[in-house]
Amino acid sequence: MAKKKSKASNSARGYATTSIPSRSASSPANKNQVKGEKNNKTQKVEPKNAFKVENQSNDIGVDTVDAFDHLLLDKTLPTIDAETEVIKNTSLSNSKSFLHSWQTDIRLRKNDNVLGLTEDEIQQILKTFRDSWKSSLKESYAFSNRSSFSLRKRYLWTTFLSLKGMGFEESEIFGAFSSIPIVSIDEYITWMITENLINSEPSNSSFSYEVQPSNYTTFCRMLDEPLPANNPVQSNSRLVPLMKDFSNDIKHTPNKETQPSNQVDDSLKSKDSKPLTMSEVLTQLPEDDIPFDDPFDLTSQYVKVKLKMLRLQIANKKNSEEFSTLNLQLESITSQYLFSSKEAEIVFRKSRIEFMNKLKALQQKLENERIVEEIKKNGIQEDSQSTDDSSKDDDNNSESNDMSPHNDAETRADDDAYLMGDLFNQEEEDIQDTENDLLNANYTLLPLTTDKSGTRPSTTLQYELHKIGSNIKAEFKTMPIGKIGYQSTCFVRCSTGQKTFSDLKTVLPTATLAADYISMIVLFRLMANFTKISLQTFPKSFKEVYGKFSAEKQNTDLAEDAKISEKLDSIIKSKELETPTSATTSKLMAPMDNIGKFSGFERPPETLLNKWRQQLESESAEKFKVFRNQLPATMFRETIIDAVNNSQLLIISGDTGCGKSTQIPAFLLENSTKNGKAVKIYVTEPRRISAISLANRVSQELGGNPPSARSHELVGYSVRLDSKCTPLTPLTYVTTGTFLRLLEVGNEIESVTHLIIDEVHERSIDSDLLLIHVLHLLKQHPHLKIIIMSATLNAEKFQLYFEGSNLITIPGKTYPVHRFYLEDILSQFGNDKSFGNAAGQDVIEEDDYETDQQDASISNKSAEDAIVEMNLIPAWYNEKAINYGLIVYLLKYIFTEGDPKFSKCVLVFLPGISEILRVKSLIEDMPMFRNHRKFCIYMLHSTLSSAQQQSVFNIPPKGCRKIVLSTNIAETGVTIPDVTCVIDTGVHREMRYNSRRHLSRLTDTFVSKANAKQRSGRAGRVQEGICYHLFSKFKHDTQFLSYQTPEILRLNLQEVVLRVKMCQMGDVQDVLGKALDPPSSTNIIRALEKLHQVGALSENEKLTKLGKFLSQLPVDANLGKILVLGCFYKCVDAASSIVAMLTIGSPFRKSVDNEFSANKARLSFAKENTRSDLVLMYYAYCAWREICLSPLGPDEDSFAKEKYLNLEALSMTESLKIQLLSELKDMKLLGASDVDTCKSLKRSICRRFAVIPKEHDINSGNAEILCGVIAASLYPNILRYDYEKRQWSTLSTNKRVRILDVSVNNRSELPNMPSKFVAYTNMMSSTRASEYVNETTMVTLRQLLMMCGLKVENRVSVGQAKLDNFTVYFENVYVSASLSILRRFIETSLNEFFAEPDKRLLNSHLEVIVNIVSRLNYGTKFQKRLKD
């Protein structure tokens, strides 16, 4: 028979296999194996492109070449430098630690406080804010580029290994590294997760928040091949008997390179064949294979519909009508009340994985079947006789082993010979051809021997598999390869799948060695990551094999490390190119040229000095000398000048009218100018009206023109937003706050020669801080002369504070003033009880101020009886009230029945603008005062314009009487020259910190004795005067303080600390410890902590941009933050109204007699889902404002009476609101040229209302966004409801707190509350053990997470966000990534807004934020637990 041609054939089998690199070697002859063979045959095993194995003897192999060594030497080995090796090892260690911690955090995830988003919300967030988020990463993490190259590389390598261990693909990871700066691992996860969503591409990563599977589960997932039909996993560990397989007949021709594991050789596929696609495979999978047929189970129906939609997506039928129908079904299911999206998604994810695995397994099966069919068509078959003959010979010569399937090989060989007869002797030529084909197939014969000293690898494999899972087994299929040896295939199987391992290039001498060899491959390839195998237990030859495998693996890893190192180097270098140059950075970090730059003292030119000298000697100046010489201060001119020249500090105590504020600065200026000396004198005043009026007066007395910012006048002034002076002006009147800001600039104080601090007795925060500055200035600037002046000065205290400084006392020039007290007034009018009528009285609430210092309370009963006996005021008269009827009656009496010499000008002292407006309205209602030719009414208040304030100094025409309604502005510093009569209510309004409410409030309190004296003195400046005090002499003598309490002791220390930080005076405790009346260190520390929480101070106690705004607002820091955030979120009207009401007091009147009706009226302002007492107050304010601004409807009084509204509080609220809006405008937070107002269209206690531009007030009607702003400002004042204990407790300290029944969130409303969190304004203590709150605002998880706190630790890697000690969990990674982007955008936008208020949020961005935050996504768990 003609010799058959040798046909090249593929070395792959008809099923998926796993192969390793081929190894060629010749083996020593086995005596039993070559027994009976033809000795003249010579075998050649010659791999292509490798090496030759030649057999020079009659045995099968004699000369052996180590195939492993050739494999290692044939290629260029990769190398990495020592530094990279250290970086890799460190990164590997760090990554293992991180992954261990990450898996622990995943296991500890809780089902409480879980936050979710809809798919539409996620897409909306990503489309709107993702680009801004990426831009913010470049700015926030630019600092990472300043670290060393090796540190950045180590960080990226650690992050790479960690992300890969978490389930992300390598391509995704390096895509993130290349696209964004060097950021945290959570930011990288956010980028990768959202990148797939943006591009609508499925993610290949397996990352999720599910608990990581056990080793058994992970191992079974690796066995991803389908199990064969009717082939259950064996229950024992013995090897499976040899099975005849058609693949034994395939001629093996290896490729140039080893095929990867579990891959089918491409050479088996025809040129025209293409791999099966998923859509093609899907047609073979019946649709009825989808489970979940329960029509009453929403979760099952949800999963079934989603799987059908998945099939359509794979089949590219997403736009079909069927897909739209399924989408509608899905929406119908998810809209059901009992539907749980979280539970349904968990079930669907598991079902999707099972479905895709089944689809992949079917694809692999169909591909293998197709390949087998092609092989059969090609007719590649071998003679079965030669195969059986070789099998017979090999079986007869194999070594015995307990686990081997060949224990009785010889007997079976005889049986085969008997059964087959003479079949082996037929056609010897064909047998020879078949053997030649096998020998030319380029196999590698591995000459291993069995060493009984060690444990067989197959036994070790079964043992290790059993340790992972008892049902995991290894089965072997061993096949002879001609006469040269055996190959074995290993099937590692569990209950869900299998994995096939084989080496198609390597042949072993015996079947047992073949099974052990493939077991070594399985141990190396599959088991290395699950168990640590001791190589000492193996036979010597297999130790060497495993060592070779390890070397190969090490080289592979080394090549992979070199590849990763190269990629990381490229990425880091590209990041360095993106970093701003050092020149640019230094330019950005450089300070502004005009800040802190001192040009030194500038001496005016001689021509200007001569001009000033001529002015001081001019006729206009001489005219005022007669008046000036009559002032008591003129008598001390030389004494004062000598004292200033001879000492650095001088204290002057001058009574009212002595001329200290006008004359002493003029003395110093005149003396220096006439002597040719250039001076720069600053005079500080507590109020802007004082500074302006004094500057005008002194300029006039010195013969000059009114102050100007252009011409070089002798006198000028500088107040906030108004400056009329030049750098050469020698005498400048400034407010105390303005001078403090001048000190902040830098070395400007070097140009000042004289500093005069006036009205120091008022003890404002600014004046006390300036006194602390004086202590430093005296030491650092010896050339500086300082004068401290006051009318009611505690001289001894100030002398002690400044260590025995000089004191000059100047008597006042005043005329006698007749003082009448309340008992005198009542007795003069015959004790008319009409003055005691409650209507028209404004009761002073004692609860709003501390009485320990204000009222000298007497606790014992005998003392109280003594007070009743000594006080001459009738019992029917309420002395704790402002009696408006008495004020009007006094005015009428003064102008009609009183002495005409006291009726030229009457000054009435009132607490605030609302009282001024009320008295003005009552006066104008009287017919006698409507004649404007006979009576002129003026108002004096800080909110009025400068022109209106200056008008009070005008002298009315002859025959016209003058009435001035003023606050305590007219006490000192401002002298109205024609005042002859004073009506003193004895009350002033001041900001006072209520330690019980933990809140600062504007409070009406009685004045001090010094204040009362100053007020009465206003009537005796030009002639003999008269003063009516509307308080009793007994109250004045026994309950009034001697001096006013300093602001530093009665204000919230947060404001004091902010002012200290604003002035850059150094450590707060050191600075305040040097104050004239230092506060306690405990209160200072508490204030610092609060400011840290608000965000006004940084971690190193530096003033933040937000802190600078808060320091300029006259309210508490928390309330100031409401104003700032109100500007940011464009709800200015609501924010300013709420802050004003919290500062003034509740707009509701209390009714002891009819509490139920009052509470019902209050709740009538509530709208649907109103869960905030503060928002309820705002609704009441809006209703009152609407009544006043509408020409129709009920009048103000009847409406207020019906709704139990406090009109005085509402009027004061509107006045303070206008003032706050002016402050916001000055700080550029409110982008309006001026605060517009509109007049009331009805007769109202409030004449004008603020008008907010519409572009700044978009969201005042959105209650949810208002609640978010309130919560963000009051944080950490948050309460959480405890289900188990059924009580409210603080979020930070878990302290039990009660909510009073007056709150809209009281206990009776708990079942109706969709959230378990509330914010509170202040917490009060009671005589009971617990504490309570009464003004609360409900907060949602979204509002807490998106708007509250300074920094949220958003850990996308574990699906949680930490807000201080409070943890929120996310439903899935998409929710976590989306909310992380949204929170980052809000934080970045806020910082930009604080830095540049003109950079406001776009309305489109704000709309998305409001929609996300405002949705009531509370869930039903809270309500369910409450009902249980």
Swiss-Prot record:
Any one annotated GO CC term: cytosol
Domain Helicase C-terminal as annotated: residue spans: 886-1064
Compositional bias annotation for Polar residues: 16-33, 256-265
Extent of Basic and acidic residues compositional bias: 34-51
Entry binding sites for ATP: 654-661
Domain Helicase ATP-binding as annotated: residue spans: 641-811
Motif DEAH box per UniProt: ranges: 758-761
Keywords: ATP-binding, Cytoplasm, Helicase, Hydrolase, Nucleotide-binding
EC numbers, comma separated: 3.6.4.-
Family statement drawn from the similarity comment of this UniProt entry: Belongs to the helicase family. SKI2 subfamily.
Record-given protein name: Uncharacterized helicase C15C4.05
Source organism: Schizosaccharomyces pombe (strain 972 / ATCC 24843) (Fission yeast)
